[in-house]
Amino acid sequence: MATPLPLVFSAPKRGMPPAHFADLSDEQRIEALSELGLPKFRLNQIARHYYGRLEADPMTMTDLPEAARAKVKDALFPTLMEPIRVVEADDENTQKTLWKLHDGTLLESVLMRYPDRATLCISSQAGCGMACPFCATGQGGLDRNLSVGEIVDQVRNAAATMQAEGGRLSNIVFMGMGEPLANYKRVVSAVRQITQPSPEGFGISQRSVTVSTVGLAPAIRKLADEDMSVTLAVSLHTPDDELRDELVPVNNRWSVAEVLDAARYYADKSGRRVSIEYALIRDVNDQGWRADMLGQKLHKALGSRVHVNLIPLNPTPGSKWDASPRERQDEFVRRVIAQGVPCTVRDTKGQEIAAACGQLAAEENSEEK
């Protein structure tokens, strides 16, 4: 049996990129412009280009003095990431991009187009330190936290793609690589930039942003106190501590009861329904009695402020884990609903391009070895 990986909460400091416009406060931006000999009002112009027009190259910002554009680019807009692989599925409605960062680490984002919306799944860390055994990213370990700029620029890239198609990016889910609440300050800063109206941000509604977590209970409570209305998604995966200690090792630190108590605090503070993510794994966590227990615990802890998303597992190559058969999925849904908790099977757009978190990066790394 493979030795379990240790939990890693503190990311290595190495490899962080040069400061980007999105990393800086307004005061820091004004100071940087002043050092370039540019007045304060240029900040508003640059912000409107970046957040409003989705431009990241000052050479195209024609209302800036021509002589200053290269200096602004060097000082505030370093190249953060380059696409090295793009894979499409679902009649090109799902697009997964593998990005190489300045230090060679990899991250992924997935753009999913639906008839009524466009959703971007973004990464908050390069790798992940939560060590969940059925997750490709968790088994790869944590390289480092992403900077605010690296998180925000995933959104700008996708928003620009949708704009070029005559559409609009409407939803953001922090469900890519990494544990968002383990990179807390940067994720919260990124959420504020994603949701503030132009020229301070991209103007996406907070209610259209989902932040996921494997259950860092103190950070869930801290997020509740930020007075934001983003959706909280808790990756629970089983209702009992005995199995969750194995599937989600952070459960050894914060139990199911502690996580659900923190989720209730978030629901009470935000007024938002909490989403419970549950990856159905054949013969591991898909038993009917676990569905009953899940529904009972969620109804007791969260009442009407909860919804269960069942996720058919995306098996990783060589893994012992496999997805539950459809009939067992349907039975699980029926039994959770019978406990008074809404439950649906999540659409698995992009399954054929390994759209589960970390799988494209894992494939790339194995090809390089």
Swiss-Prot record:
Protein name: Probable dual-specificity RNA methyltransferase RlmN
Cofactor: [4Fe-4S] cluster
EC code(s) of this entry: 2.1.1.192
Miscellaneous field: Reaction proceeds by a ping-pong mechanism involving intermediate methylation of a conserved cysteine residue.
Active-site residues from the entry: 108 (proton acceptor), 357 (s-methylcysteine intermediate)
Keyword Zinc: no
Species annotation: Corynebacterium efficiens (strain DSM 44549 / YS-314 / AJ 12310 / JCM 11189 / NBRC 100395)
Name of a matching Pfam family: Radical_SAM
Top-tier EC class: transferase
GO biological process: rRNA base methylation; tRNA methylation
Ranges for domain Radical SAM core: 114-352
Catalytic activity annotation: adenosine(2503) in 23S rRNA + 2 reduced [2Fe-2S]-[ferredoxin] + 2 S-adenosyl-L-methionine = 2-methyladenosine(2503) in 23S rRNA + 5'-deoxyadenosine + L-methionine + 2 oxidized [2Fe-2S]-[ferredoxin] + S-adenosyl-L-homocysteine; adenosine(37) in tRNA + 2 reduced [2Fe-2S]-[ferredoxin] + 2 S-adenosyl-L-methionine = 2-methyladenosine(37) in tRNA + 5'-deoxyadenosine + L-methionine + 2 oxidized [2Fe-2S]-[ferredoxin] + S-adenosyl-L-homocysteine
Function, in words: Specifically methylates position 2 of adenine 2503 in 23S rRNA and position 2 of adenine 37 in tRNAs.
Family: Belongs to the radical SAM superfamily. RlmN family.
One Gene Ontology CC term in the entry: cytoplasm
Chain residues that bind S-adenosyl-L-methionine: 178-179, 212, 235-237, 314
Keywords assigned: 4Fe-4S, Cytoplasm, Disulfide bond, Iron, Iron-sulfur, Metal-binding, Methyltransferase, rRNA processing, S-adenosyl-L-methionine, Transferase, tRNA processing
A molecular-function term among this protein's GO annotations: rRNA binding
Record keyword Disulfide bond present: yes
Location relative to the cell: Cytoplasm
Annotated binding of [4Fe-4S] cluster, by residue: 128, 132, 135
Domain of life, source organism: Bacteria
Cysteine disulfide links: 121-357
InterPro entries associated with the record: Aldolase_TIM, Methyltransferase_A, RNA_MTrfase_RlmN, rRNA_lsu_MTrfase_RlmN/Cfr, rSAM
Note on cofactor: Binds 1 [4Fe-4S] cluster. The cluster is coordinated with 3 cysteines and an exchangeable S-adenosyl-L-methionine.
